[in-house]
Amino acid sequence: MKSRVNNLSLEKTDCDLCGSGNYKNLYSVPDLRFKNFKHEYSVVQCINCGHRYLSPRPSKDSMHLIYHDNYYKNRNEVDLKQKNRFILQADYLPKIANGKILDIGCAGGGFLKFLKNKGWKCYGVDFIKTKYKEKGINIKYGYLPERSFPKLFFNVITAWGVMEHVHEPSVYFEIINKILDNKGLFIFLIPNGDSLWSRWAFKEDIPRHIHFFRPKIIKEYARQYGFKVHKIYYTNKLYSRPASGKGLFKRRFLRSLDIPWVKIINNSFDLSMLKKIQYYFMKIFDALLIHPKLEELFHLCGNMVVILKKDIK
């Protein structure tokens, strides 16, 4: 994994939402998930519109270098946890007889098979061709902009944890508007860029996440590409492990002492007696003040489910 990242190609980019090249740096982190500390990636915020994104970011041609060999394994194994998630995801869908649905980032089609058994006509698209594929599910492989679908064809389009990974969300919004029925819904799960998990605890999956959407930014994307926001749900329930900000007090305290990320993640730092006492109180604050249910209540949890309707003038 680390040797592959040495060949990573990075590119500076303008804001996908407004096109401005003016931004300010918010913070930089290495690949904490896979403990690759060779390079730190910068999260920036557009000065013009406020959208947050990675710049420089891995180029599209080199994105495969930042995915661990086992990264996609769980996407193709439909276990009890996944089945429970399918039930929760389906609750966001409308009740439509013989409705046509497209799932972007469908992996092997497990969610679509679940929906097919409930009467949906199912289609999928995924940029990774998996070894495992559900029988009877129409899946096209490649990025959405590389695959064609009829205009006004789908009643519902879903994308569960996809939009934060794509280089040009604007292109996706534009295409989805064209292939979605005028009364259709675009339903997608994304990390909440305003959450404790994302903004303050440094837990975003950087550099695989390259866009960091906030509610006001979603509303602006919707406006620009012919949608209106029907509903935003702030939830930690879709995954067995909540996207919680727990640990943020500890992490931010250690970073304030200029302790390198490699020592923080590997828990190999030394503190003076005074700093140990302060660190102990940070752990207490994390335990007492941060809880997934409270994060949901105050819209500070790590995930949002967004439902967009087409804005027909």
Walk through the language-model features, giving the residues of each.
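S-adenosyl-L-methionine-dependent methyltransferase catalytic module, highlighting the catalytic core
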Residues: 167-175, 185-309
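Short hydrophobic/aromatic beta-strand or adjacent loop that forms the aromatic wall/cage
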Residues: 39-43, 160, 300-306
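Short low-complexity, flexible loop/linker segments enriched in glycine and/or proline
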Residues: 40, 71, 137-141, 202-204, ...
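Conserved SAM-binding loop
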Residues: 3-12, 86-202, 209-225, 304-310
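Active-site beta-strand termini and strand-to-loop segments that position acidic
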Residues: 46-48, 308-311
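N-terminal juxtadomain amphipathic helix
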Residues: 1-78
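Conserved SAM-binding loop and adjacent beta-strand
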Residues: 74-88
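Hydrophobic anchor at the start of a short beta-strand
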Residues: 23, 122-123, 229-230
